[in-house]
Structures are given as structure tokens and as C-alpha cells.
């Protein structure tokens, strides 16, 4: 008579273990191991810090819809830039709020304007900081659009080619004040070529262009328009900013900017367009920037204030996802907060 031996509990466990041939959890076992094999690491040096500059006649004001973000005068901007540099951030992006507005945004090329003053002051006090200046007319026009308004067939619209001349004047003014990069965000056709030509003709060939190459007509810009006081007074910006549905068109826009002389290409917004960031990274050799925009920032802050999410953890996850998608540089209002937690 043959006796069948019932497998012991320990034998059964061994059988199960032998069936598991791959154990990815080994690489997640401790924080030091996780850090050792981490594929994507965001550093403060990867970030560009957006700052809003107001005239000296105004005071420092926190933006209600963007907790932790302020409108500041040039002297306060310099102090913030110095703190940012000490925290490891190597670039700031300046947006200006002028003393007065008109139909063509003429205050944007005033040599004594808020952005020009801030550029000069930063370069005196924090000379190693890379200073970028946003080039657009919406903050400076009384109608809030990004160019010269004309009437066509009874409808108001932005005239592309008239606007180019004004964008060049604005970019030149920022470059002459000492900006390292100008950053056209208007989405006019041909603006990169026009600005590059204007800079080169005035022997400002060292000044780079970070182009908002694929800028979508997004609902995520709301808080920014409060911060920059740039909401359009009529209509919207869909005749010049891109349709959110169009990924292939984004690559055509980026390719044009590359051909026209852009030094850095950008996708804006970031989170809803991670696929575009990845496509841009795969297709083009230039540095890719992505703008983690105001609405993305404010959603995190609002949810964190309600206790619904861990704001710091979500911030880190968002920035990591943007870099993982292919961005070399991330423009983000989280920059200082991230830099502080990174150093800690």
C-alpha cells in the first residue's frame, strides 16, 4: 500500500514562492533603494520661477486665487530673486503690470517700465540669475488682447502683422535692459522670426528666445489673468491660441518656431498636454519647457487648504510627471516651495 504524504504548510509556501520569478518590489523595499533606482529627479535648477512686477506706485499684494504668489515692485522682485537663487533656482520669468494701458500696449517698451526696471535691478544684485521676460501685449492693452485690434467684416480681431512690429519693440526693450531671454507668448504667426531678426540687427544676438510654441486656448489660465490683470474685455483668444484638441498642429507650430530661430520651445499648459510634451521631446533636439500654469497651481492649493490632498506630495508628483513626460525646464509657481522642500 502506497502512502501519500500531504505537503506541509511550509512546502506549499515554497511552491508558491518558486512560481514568482520576478520580484520588482525588491527595488522598492527601502527609501535608499528607491532613490538609487529613481528614473526621474526634479531639481530646483530645472525650474523657472514666474514673477509679477508692478510699478513702484503700487504695493506688494498677494493674489487671492493663487495663495503664495504676489504682485511685487522691482525692489521686492530683486529680494525674491536673491532668495530663489540661494534656494537653487537659476531662472526667473518676469510679467509686467504697467502704470497705464492703451490700445497698442505702448507702455511695454518704456525703458523705465516695471519689467525693464526689474531686469536691471536683478542683473545688478543677482548677476548670475538668468532673467527671462514674457513678450506679449495683453497685460499692457486696454482691451486685454495680445495684439492690435482691427475690425474685419463687422468683427473685432487681432491683426497679426501689425502686432509683430510691436512685439519686436517690446522684446528689444527687454533685451536692452539686460534680459537673457525673451519669451513671446502671443501666438502670432512669424513672431519668433521677427524678434530674432530684430535682436540680431541691433547686435543683441546673445539674447535667446524661449518661444511659447504650443500655447493652447485653455481654461486653466483664469488665475493668471487676475494676477496679470490681463483678461480680454471682449471675446476670447481662440483665433490665435491653439485648439486643445489638436496635437499634430502643436508639432507643426513647434517646428515653425524651431525653423524661425527659437532656442527653447515650450508647451503650455503642462498637465493636460503631457502627450504633446512627450511628442515634442521625441521629435525635436532643442530644450523643451513646459508651463505648469496658474489653474493647475490653484487647484492644488485649494484642495490642500480643504484638507483633501497632501499639497506637498501632489506638487512633487505633478512636477515629476511633467519632467518624466520629457520637459527639460518647468515654469511653475511652486518653484520656491519646491526648492525649500528639496533642500530640506
Residue ranges and their predicted role:
Residues 18, 30, 43-48, 54-344:
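Alpha/beta enzyme core
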Residues 2-38:
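N-terminal amphipathic/basic leader segments beginning at the initiator methionine
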